[in-house]
């Protein structure tokens, strides 16, 4: 029997009840035999370190119903929404997924209408969606009457754009989000759903009574047994980097433009915590997520040529028995290298950037992230 796969682009930061609902809906809406997750690695799209590492989050995903977890590399994950979407669509298409299932505030959004009114000048489009997101959204509203402001609506739109640009390899299946909004900062009492933002805040505070109702048991157990990570853990490393690096070197890093390097360096001298640093550097011109990504690029010493979102390889993080069967089915038809074990060649070659991202986390946690690590196999009993 030929297995058919539905793809999900995700971060599982951490895996919560809303994600479990999405997986169940994906199976119901598509009839897929396999759920494939393209999951951000140790750093996520907001420019933050994931609260748990990619292996812990893979374990939670497999327990929650995902069949195959493949890493969305840092070159795609640490990007503005349009580039994040390009990389994610390419990963799922390369893995021969038939559907892309994604949560959105407005599942009836007319993506075709929006795409028909994109700016004709690519340079303007790039300027809008990287630096002037609000102008871009205003432009589309003026052209179409459609308001594109909610986080998942914006990401869904860029999935549609990327899918069109890549020849529409995936059938889009938008789902109405269940529960709280994407960036809600508090867990509402009496509910089984909360935003990942609120769950991270409660977890970092050790408020397990608040977390318990809104995450599966496996996620709760992992959160309670692991050392949880935030930007605060990397602040000394970032501060040293910003203070010691010449501005001429900083300008060579990815997306460090328009003189922001001077502002970041001054803030590093003044601030004593990462929260202080962000407060000092924030302006109306730049969002917090853009500034956090710039901080991550500098910490990582990322060069523009390293940050191309199109995948160069596919790193398998984990699978169920069904996921393993699907991998066996497609492996001869996948155009990119499938990496199950990171070796020295991977570290020195296509995996260099992700190896550095993992090494940064290892500096804080002491847990190796890449070299020699093999995919997690979901126990048959789960």
From Swiss-Prot:
Annotated ATP binding sites: 9-22, 103, 152, 177
Matching NCBIfam families, A to Z?
PRK13670.1
Q: Which Gene3D superfamilies match?
A: HUPs
- Role description: Catalyzes the formation of N(4)-acetylcytidine (ac(4)C) at the wobble position of elongator tRNA(Met), using acetate and ATP as substrates. First activates an acetate ion to form acetyladenylate (Ac-AMP) and then transfers the acetyl group to tRNA to form ac(4)C34.
**Any single GO CC term annotated in Swiss-Prot or TrEMBL for this entry:** cytoplasm
Instruction: Provide a Gene Ontology MF annotation, just one.
Output: ligase activity, forming carbon-nitrogen bonds
Q: What is this protein called?
A: tRNA(Met) cytidine acetate ligase
Swiss-Prot/TrEMBL keywords:
ATP-binding, Cytoplasm, Ligase, Nucleotide-binding, RNA-binding, tRNA processing, tRNA-binding
Q: Which organism is it from?
A: Levilactobacillus brevis (strain ATCC 367 / BCRC 12310 / CIP 105137 / JCM 1170 / LMG 11437 / NCIMB 947 / NCTC 947) (Lactobacillus brevis)
Superkingdom in the source lineage: Bacteria
Q: Record keywords: tRNA-binding included?
A: yes
